[in-house]
């Protein structure tokens, strides 16, 4: 699947001028509120006409302003999941799901009803009414309804934004299964770096209506400038589960040339995982420290130092091929005489396993 988007649109004082190309998987639009994420996904969906630009899916021109082409939203065969589930309150879960089948061409019904309800874990909900569902359950049903329409592309506009942390934790594993077990490309809108780090293959960073960066999630989310909130800056690494210590509930994850020990549930050896290390949780030392409770200490070489905010600096460290970010005070940087090329030891206080 190849999706090409070029869009210009003026909305009052706000101006959107964005372009990107996606080759499938999960492409995440990431940025602060008001950055243009929803405006852009609405143009892709056919819910809004751009003032200029084009939307092309696998060579088919869905929008091209110079040629006067605009395929209506109902003919694009895109699934759309909103912040709110928007289920029909008078229909059961089963009937809501069946409604999605009305929009699937008979020749294109690639996903069976049973497979979808198993994928989303909604077998026990089929006879309930939407009023008797939790927020997370409603969103899973809404996703199922969209999938049963056999979409060529699934658009998800902040589907977890209205949920509390417990409901988000409930639904994220199902979104991972959706990503891994179907071939449906997804455009996913979020301002949560944790969601994007866990789900996305490609990231498009938007700011003030313009694309600031685009590329693989591991590369983009490891840049200090990518975080919508400075507190969220950090490194995203890919690794493989080496082993699981049942006694201490620790997984050993092998990176390119290093290993990390991470508190986790039982993980199968050989499983690929993503690891997020917030820059605020990485301390630096110029000699290998001893007598610390920290389990993860990596040796590396400083690649770059950039000024941060409020008297801080962001330091990028190459740890045998894995890039780690550390945010420390400018005073600490001066006292340790830190500079590019110097060897340091990164003391990692917190590691988040992103799935």
From Swiss-Prot:
Question: What Gene3D superfamilies would the database entry show?
Answer: 2.40.50.100, P-loop containing nucleotide triphosphate hydrolases
- Name the SMART domains on file: AAA (SM00382)
Chief localization: membrane
Q: Which UniProt keywords apply?
A: ATP-binding, Cell inner membrane, Cell membrane, Membrane, Molybdenum, Nucleotide-binding, Translocase, Transport
A Pfam family it matches? ABC_tran
- Give all residue intervals belonging to the Mop domain: 291-355
Q: Where in the cell is it found?
A: Cell inner membrane
What Enzyme Commission number(s) does the record list for this chain? Answer: 7.3.2.5
What is the role of the protein in this entry?
Answer: Part of the ABC transporter complex ModABC involved in molybdenum import. Responsible for energy coupling to the transport system.
Record note on quaternary structure? The complex is composed of two ATP-binding proteins (ModC), two transmembrane proteins (ModB) and a solute-binding protein (ModA).
Q: What is this protein called?
A: Molybdenum import ATP-binding protein ModC
Phylogenetic lineage: Bacteria, Pseudomonadati, Pseudomonadota, Alphaproteobacteria, Hyphomicrobiales
